[in-house]
Amino acid sequence: MSDHLGSSHDEGELSDESHKKSQRASSSDEPNPAKSNKGLESKMRESILSRLSKRKNSESDDDTTEQRFSIQPKNAQKAKEDRYRDKERDKKREKDKRDDRRDVRGPDARQKDRDFKGRQERSGRDQKVHEHRHHHHHRKHETDGHRTNRSNRDRSSERDSEKHKRHIDRHKKSSTTSPDNDKSPHKKSKHTDVPADAKLFDRILDPNYKKKDDDVLVIEDVEMSPIEILEEKEEKEIVEFTIDSPAGPKKYSKFESDPESDHDDTKPKSPGKAEDDDDVIEVLDDALHSDDDADSDEDKYLKTPEDREWEEMTETEQRLHKEAMKKRASMKQKTLIAQLPVFYPGLMGCRNIDEYECVNRVDEGTFGVVYRGKDKRTDEIVALKRLKMEKEKEGFPITALREINMLLKAGNHPNIVNVKEILLGSNMDKIYMAMEFVEHDMKSLLDTMSRRNKRFSIGEQKTLLQQLLSGIEHMHKLWILHRDLKTSNLLMSHKGILKIADFGLAREYGDPLKKFTSIVVTLWYRSPELLLGTRLYSTPVDMWSVGCIMAEFILLKPLFPGRGELEQIKKIFMEMGTPTESIWPGVTELDGWKALTFEKYPYNQLRKRFLAGRLLNDTGFKLLNGLLTLDPKNRFSATQALDHEWFTEEPYPVPPEEFPTFPAKSEQNKAPPPAKQKQQENRISHVDPETAKLLKQFEVRPEQVKPGGFSLKFDPTRF
């Protein structure tokens, strides 16, 4: 068919009959065509007729392309384009379906899918063994179709999103290439991707097809670009302006010399209208003048006015001056504080003991030696307790840790000594604990009063016992047992404040009770249940010690001074009476009671000792007897003792500030004996002027001069 048509093309023009014959000849060569081939033939026939009509018009006159297309049959070209577009759309759909089945994606998407499957395989290792085997067996026997379905199911959500994105892109391309929307001369996409059959007829009928084909390819390259080609627009000129006033950058500069100040003249400013420049400059000038006025007003209050100026001021000016004076004082204080070196315990650790000056040694206890020290920075007097570390070869002593922990927990009370900080010496064996310094310990004070035959008054006894019970109540509410209450662990300041110290044996207790060791508390203040070997105890052991301390406040000596545990329990039973099951239920079950046999002493002989000597009245003796009850369950608690009527009857407790002061042994400030004092006074009075002048040159006081045992005497007559 192509040869025949080609020969007719050389003859000049084809007739309708020759065209029909050629069509019949071509149709006769083909075997029985289907219905779809008839449709294709009709389309081809229409296209050939349209091209023949174009050929005739082009030979008849030299009209333009628009004029030649105007004589076409009605809607013929549009129908042709619609058919081409429908076919192309069907082909694209089939191609997309094939791509979805074959998983045609980019390398990044395939790598993500492989990573996702790898994560699934790694997570599968944590499953049970039988589930893994079952899954492996299932995959071993599955068919290729099952594998395909499973791979499709295992695709990640990213593939679905990519598929959706491709669908949207295809929709956008189809919408942008429609002839109704694209009327621009640059967008002739309706002639792109023409089917092969149509290109065949173009090649036959048009001798200039090759040139047109090249043009079409160029158009395709332009139209396939996703970026819309816009017409070039002329760029608008940017208006620049600068502010000539020096107020701009310097007003808001944070530093005296701005690093960018050298480039302010050349740096472009924000675009704006020229008529707005004057407004900007006026605003900046107003701000500068307002600030200058404010500074000048503040300068008036920088100095304290004199008396004459103060009297001439109004009330408002005086008030402003007072506020300025307060502000200057606070700023001065802040400046002084800022000059001090900052100490961060969490970053810098503990301070060194060299920052304290050791004044003198105070006492030595079970767990350390106590010194009186002075802070070199603040001149504050503190108590420095050096912890004993001789036997600690494997770290910090547990007793010291307990003491620090208990003091930090219970130290927020006026009747409990407060720890300030932990200090380190030259090595780790020298660890100190800085606590508030209290001048007296009650043991030394009671001994001094006993030697001088002096006693506390009843009001003073009530004050001391009330403060002791207040501190004990605070500890017991925090579930803390002191377990070593005695007069040497009670401190008293010059202001009459009693404080509880030495928490080396303190422990926390709970409910139900824990088993503790029974070898606690100094022997003279140890409760009978501890002496009999019980290990389940709580606050009553401290209250027994409080009863012994109350009796010592009155007697100025210990109540039960035993020399051993057997003698101690015997002394207790002699004064309080031998207990029975009716007096103390459960006493016969204690280990000490089972191991020993005790004599039967009459019940409670303390009445004769305190009442007969008129040391206590009946109310006070009831309180003492309640604190020294043998049965720990019936013994008074700290709250019950504080609520006792003995503290509310006359004589009332003496206020702490009215307590008498005593010379503190810890301060070592005893006055010299009278004989030595007179001798020093005589020595100072008999100093001759020349010796006094010499001592002044050497900055030596006369009382510091000690007479020597040997001196040379010269006879003035010989010289």
Curated annotation (Swiss-Prot):
Gene Ontology annotations for the cellular component aspect, listed alphabetically: cytoplasm; nucleus
One BP annotation, GO: positive regulation of embryonic development
Annotated ATP binding sites: 362-370, 385
Compositional bias ranges of the Acidic residues kind: 275-285
Enzyme class name: transferase
Enzyme Commission designation: 2.7.11.22
Annotated catalysed reactions: L-seryl-[protein] + ATP = O-phospho-L-seryl-[protein] + ADP + H(+); L-threonyl-[protein] + ATP = O-phospho-L-threonyl-[protein] + ADP + H(+)
Spans traversing the lipid bilayer: none
Gene3D superfamilies: Phosphorylase Kinase, domain 1 (3.30.200.20), Transferase(Phosphotransferase) domain 1 (1.10.510.10)
Biased composition annotated in UniProt, kind: Basic residues: 130-140, 164-174
Superkingdom to which the source organism belongs: Eukaryota
UniProt keyword annotation of Cytoplasm present: no
Comp. bias intervals (Basic and acidic residues): 1-20, 38-48, 78-129, 141-163, 191-215, 264-274, 678-689
InterPro entries: CDK, CDK11/PITSLRE_STKc, Kinase-like_dom_sf, Prot_kinase_dom, Ser/Thr_kinase_AS
CDD domains: STKc_CDC2L1 (cd07843)
Catalytic residues (UniProt): 484
Domain Protein kinase as annotated: residue spans: 356-647
Function: Probable cyclin-dependent kinase whose activity is most likely regulated by the cyclin cyl-1/Cylin-L. Important for normal oocyte and sperm development; probably required during multiple stages of gametogenesis. Plays a role in the activation of RAS-ERK signaling in the germ line. Also acts partially redundantly with cdk-11.2 to ensure embryonic viability.
UniProt name for this protein: Cyclin-dependent kinase 11.1
Organism: Caenorhabditis elegans
